[in-house]
A protein has these predicted regions:
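Short conserved AdoMet
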Residues: 85, 119, 133
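Conserved class I S-adenosyl-L-methionine
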Residues: 139-170, 176, 180
């Protein structure tokens, strides 16, 4: 079994044990996609690579794409189909996003929170580019190497043990107790005044962002981080290399945006000639 297949199966255990619907709020969805907005999506063909249980697609349909397709290697596609039941012009496809090649490229291709879990994140990015039509937009989000020292040195070693255990053990005996201190830390950061001293604390911006959510979401995020067999923390320099080394990309349109102090949003357009 390939490592990406193991990862897909691990995440299916995560996604398939959530309540029906999207685990994300409207504000979280819009934050992940900025600088893209509804006007960029409306009436366009849109592809999500690594759709999980369809949590992002549930929000994406509200932006009224002409056609929306999600691809995922795991059995979470079953839950995605349930969450998207009754929506018109929506399709969920079970397949390897790295190998996926659409007969017709899409106007918009996005990959949120998936590339960093692949055996080869760069090959995943190549699929994003390959499936975007000339003049179309691509948009990705990945964990950053920058700003994640606490995660890399404390959480990631735990992941190497937890990821080989049964999902329920990882969720309830690892993710739950591990996330309690960070839950309290994030809620405290939200209450404290926004002064320069506190802004130097670990994961400060991320703590303020996630503090808007309930404990169950904290645990979902922790479980996601612990259940996967592999996680890469990608430096900005690597993303710059991905973007600048591909002649298909219109270099005048590219962007790399730090999100919450510990992740990167990046994207651009495919050149028309």
């Amino acid at each position: 079994m390939g490592s990406d297949t193991k990862t897909a199966e691990a995440f299916a255990n995560s996604w398939n044990n959530l309540p029906e619907g999207s685990v994300y709020t409207k504000d979280q969805f819009e934050d992940w996609f900025a600088p893209l907005t509804r006007k960029d999506i409306e009436g366009k063909s849109v592809l999500e690579l690594g759709c999980g249980n369809g949590s992002l697609m549930v929000h994406m349909v509200i932006w009224k794409p002409e056609y929306l397709e999600g691809v995922d290697l795991g059995d979470s596609v079953v839950t995605a189909e349930i969450n998207l039941a009754g929506r018109e012009n929506v399709q969920v496809t079970k397949g390897d996003l790295v190998e996926f090649t659409s007969p017709e490229p899409f106007d918009i291709v996005y990959c949120i929170g998936v590339l960093h879990h692949l055996q080869s994140p760069e090959k995943g990015f190549e699929s994003v580019i390959r499936n975007t039509k000339a003049g179309g937009n691509f948009h990705c989000w990945v964990y950053a190497r920058e700003g994640n020292a606490v995660i890399r040195y404390i959480v990631d070693p735990v992941r190497k043990v937890a990821s080989v255990l049964p999902w329920w053990m990882t969720k309830y005996f690892f993710a739950t107790p591990l996330v309690v201190p960070f839950y309290l830390y994030a809620k405290l950061m939200k209450l404290l005044p926004k002064i320069a001293l506190f802004k130097k604390l670990p994961l400060y911006e991320y703590a303020l962002w996630i503090a808007e959510r309930e404990f169950a979401f904290f645990r979902h995020v922790a479980f996601d981080q612990l259940v996967t067999p592999q996680t890469a923390y990608i430096p900005k320099a690597t993303i710059e290399q991905w973007l600048t080394s591909r002649k298909e990309i219109d270099q005048k349109t590219t962007y790399i945006i730090m999100r919450n102090g510990n992740s990167w949003k990046f994207g651009g357009k495919i050149a028309t000639s």
